Amino acid sequence: MNGTEGSNFYIPMSNRTGLVRSPYDYTQYYLAEPWKFKALAFYMFLLIIFGFPINVLTLVVTAQHKKLRQPLNYILVNLAFAGTIMVIFGFTVSFYCSLVGYMALGPLGCVMEGFFATLGGQVALWSLVVLAIERYIVVCKPMGSFKFSANHAMAGIAFTWFMACSCAVPPLFGWSRYLPEGMQTSCGPDYYTLNPEYNNESYVMYMFSCHFCIPVTTIFFTYGSLVCTVKAAAAQQQESESTQKAEREVTRMVILMVLGFLFAWVPYASFAAWIFFNRGAAFSAQAMAVPAFFSKTSAVFNPIIYVLLNKQFRSCMLNTLFCGKSPLGDDESSSVSTSKTEVSSVSPA
């Protein structure tokens, strides 16, 4: 056995030397040098100071500007809300525990951090699925003339939270569990043990199939179809230039958000899958810590991409930050608003 299993923890180190200690009661400096824990704490601090303001700013700006409250933007606000929850209830725990070198908040703090990290990550993933399907319906028009309404957007948001809860809640009630992972200062579902009491194997198979493979496959299918349709429409000049431009802008923005999410989560999911399918294989706590902490950047990627690529939101954000006097002026925001509205109600050619 290449690891040590205890009450509510699994450490990827044999206890033959007697070094292993509970991550809830003792510093874990035998897993890595103290400076590496401080480096993780600094990394989490950066995610907090960038992630919290930009996610909250997204919510505030959308609340202040009525023209941003379009059906397409509902799901983007949902992403920002999920990111805010991750920062407040997850990142702060990881920051503090990395700073002190162990899971100082105990099993309850571990469960809280693991739950909110899983919940936020799943809301983000399923929000991107809803975005992909919405773009597919509007641009590829498989349903003919279709207008994406506020009711559709709210149903999409409800769907994202239902799916996220169906993944994050079971470990709270005995189907799997949340354990410290990596250098034992952040937490996630139990991929490591075969404890029959928690039915970990069935949960991990369910999670990978229903909450990773299916949504990622859906995203790739819809965007593959979407890219082909946009290229064909541009070649045939089937739609107005402003509509084509707006479709390209929105599509580029959402594709980058998807790539950002995959960039953050695929390394973690891949490493967790390797651990699950190679039970007993040796791996270091530091090797697991890197993808586990890197996955948390997804809470920062999406709002940054949204701010950089959405001219309408950028104009409204500057308007808010400069107390009602946007340096870009009103002409650009008006033209962008018109094009975005046009995209949401495109009829078949």
From Swiss-Prot:
Entry-listed glycosylation sites: 2, 15, 200
Ranges per topology, Extracellular: 1-36, 100-113, 177-202, 277-284
Subcellular location: Membrane
Disulfide bonds: 110-187
Main location: membrane
Membrane topology: Multi-pass membrane protein
Recorded GO CC terms: photoreceptor outer segment; plasma membrane
Entry's family note: Belongs to the G-protein coupled receptor 1 family. Opsin subfamily.
Protein's name in the database: Green-sensitive opsin-1
Originating species: Danio rerio
